[in-house]
Amino acid sequence: RRQRARRRQFALLGLAVLLIVLIFAFRHLISTPQQSGADGDTGNSGTSATEEVKQVAKAVNVYQSVMYYQPVVQKYAEQNGIPEYTDVLLAIMQVESGGKLTDIMQSSGSAGLPNDSLEEESSIRQGCTYFAHLLSKGKSLDCDLDCIIQAYNYGSGFLDYAAKFNGVYSTELAEKFAEKQSGGNTIQYDNPMAVQENGGWRYAYGNMFYARLVKQYLIE
């Protein structure tokens, strides 16, 4: 009888251990996020890489070479507290490099470094950090998003300038700032948007078409 009782105890103990193991395994399975992206270190609450790309692609229409970096952009956007601007950052990357340059967001200058001195991920990290700074300053000055996007190209001083005009972006506002900063000097610019509007030129400071170039890759 004692042996039977012991066998029952061992059997019950074994079943209890097995049940605990199964419970932990199941909880781990449902709580582990799927990894995504070029470097495989960005998770998004169980969303697969393909699903993430489709979600962003609904808001932004850019080259596949840019979409390749979407998980990295999203990671640093989240670190800077601006995940909802991931699509805007991808559109900025499209205009800056088309996803084909090493300093992929052309952000070296905003960090006080020589141009084209950052590698891809460092460039994305700095680009996201800089945009977050512009976003914070722009909001404090009541500037709209187009002004903030234009400031990525012109520098944060454009936000101070725009704030004097109620912080509302316009083509004329961007042109006047570039005219002032360039001393009225112009250069040839063969972008189709410029060719259609003025025959193909811009002021020799930044790119007065910048916000509009970025916005053409965003799907409203």
Regions found by a protein language model. Give the residues of each.
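Short, charged helix-capping/linker segments at alpha-helix termini
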Residues: 77-86, 142
